[in-house]
Amino acid sequence: MKKTRFLFLVCPATSLILELLPWGEVLNFGQPDGEPIRQTYSYFSLTPFGYANFGPLITAVLSCVLLVLSIAAVIRPVQRLWRANGNVAIVAALVSLMPRVMFGARYFTPIGGAITLLLVAHTVLMIVLLKRAEKSADTN
């Protein structure tokens, strides 16, 4: 069980590392020749936020909160922390899809997809851990 709890830190830490990379978010700028200029940014960059692409920055902040909650849940395994962790992970995963929903596939990168998958994997792992904890509490 303890190894599983430490595995619980891998998904938020990896997603945070991917969010720091400068290839996570895309902005397409028009030019007179017709072919758009594609520029990529980090999830923590304020430039996409300034162009009304709010999803990446909100996802990055929620991932930081998720990592802190995960560390707290590993140190002090309380049911409340696990549930809060799951709620934040679900919201972060949904918000990470915002660029694809609002602007289309051209604004979604493979790194953005990996971040979304890591957040979903974290949510699934959290649900599995909660089910195990409930089963062990029922048998005791």
Stretches found by the model and what they are:
Residues 54-95:
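Loop-to-transmembrane helix junctions at the membrane interface
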Residues 21, 72-78, 128-134:
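Structural signal for the C-terminal ends of transmembrane alpha-helices
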Residues 1-3, 79-88, 134-139:
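Membrane-interface extramembranous regions at the lipid-water interface
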Residues 8-14, 63-68, 117-131:
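Hydrophobic cores of alpha-helical transmembrane segments in multi-pass inner/ER membrane proteins
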Residues 14-22, 91-101:
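Aromatic-anchored segments of alpha-helical transmembrane domains
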